[in-house]
Design a protein with these regions (language model features):
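Acidic active-site catalytic centers that drive phospho-/nucleotidyl reactions
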Residues: 38, 42, 61-62, 77-80, ...
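DPxDG-like acidic metal-binding loop motif
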Residues: 68-127, 144
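N-terminal subdomain of lithium-sensitive/metallo-dependent phosphomonoesterases centered on the IMPase/IPPase/PAP
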Residues: 1-79
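Short loop segments at secondary-structure junctions
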Residues: 99-103, 113, 122-125, 131, ...
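Residue-level signal for inorganic ion chemistry
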Residues: 15, 38, 49, 82, ...
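An extended, acidic
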Residues: 134-248
Length: 248
């Protein structure tokens, strides 16, 4: 775990050297933005992992897959929320998760501009800056705060009706940025977070951070995991209600 935490922390501090500086932006084939900070942060994390775990596979957003087929696979998102990063919004994150034979067993999400580190390891709980944290104990959906990434994306991915049901049934729907919303659920500051499109490198750390905090992370149908191309973080108490609202 120490290698993971140090790599994520140091990569995050590296990104702060570019944050708020008007760093140049390029665009990938899918029109998503990338900066030199994304590239250098991933290179730093990769170098640490390769030195410590030479037999492990690595899946990174910027540099692809190495040692495909390895039983141990690290997922790196060097800057989750690049669009926020390039505009000086402090809610971006550096994400890292380890999957062993299909199960995420440890993960970390570091928010450099906030200096918040959320991490978990299987059987050891979830921690925020070293303090144990748990999901909220809310049992009434009508009092729940539910975060989301982009409201329009629910329509684009055929989830518009489900999203409208969630809006009607819940107390408040703040549009928290990307990984930060999932971290807010794990640390007891939000009851649920919905993301209708999510890659494995975006999701990986939350596959262990949420369960170890007493919550759920998985798809909108109740299947835990990081490979569904969508993601929901929610407290265990409110999971049945959220699944009912999201039912197609």
């Amino acid at each position: 775990m120490q290698v993971c935490l140090e790599a994520v922390h140091d990569a995050g501090r590296l990104t702060l050297g570019y944050f708020g500086t008007g760093v140049g932006v390029d665009y990938k084939g899918d029109d998503s933005p990338v900066t030199i900070a994304d590239v250098k942060a991933e290179e730093l994390i990769r170098s640490r992992l390769e030195a410590a775990f030479p037999d492990h596979g690595i899946v990174g957003e910027e540099h692809g897959v190495s040692r495909e087929g390895a039983t141990h696979r690290w997922y790196i998102d060097p800057i989750d929320g690049t669009k926020s990063f390039i505009r000086g919004v402090p809610l971006y994150a550096v994400l890292l998760g380890l999957e062993v034979e299909g199960e995420v067993v440890l993960g970390a999400a570091y928010f450099p501009a906030l200096d918040e580190m959320v991490h978990a390891a299987k059987g050891h709980g979830t921690h925020l800056n070293g303090r144990r944290c748990m999901v909220r104990d809310t049992t009434d959906l009508a009092r729940a705060m539910v975060g989301f990434t982009d409201a329009a994306s629910f329509e684009r991915h055929g989830r518009g009706a489900a999203w409208r049901r969630v809006m009607d049934a819940t107390y408040h729907r703040p549009g928290w940025s990307d990984a930060y919303g999932h971290a807010l659920v794990a640390t007891g500051r939000l009851e649920a977070m919905l993301d209708p499109i999510l890659n494995a490198h975006d999701a990986a750390p939350f596959g262990i951070i949420l369960p170890e905090a007493g919550g759920y992370f998985g798809d909108f149908a109740g299947n835990p995991g990081i490979h569904a191309a969508e993601g929901m973080s929610v407290t265990a108490a409110l999971l049945p209600d959220m699944l009912r609202l999201l039912e197609a």
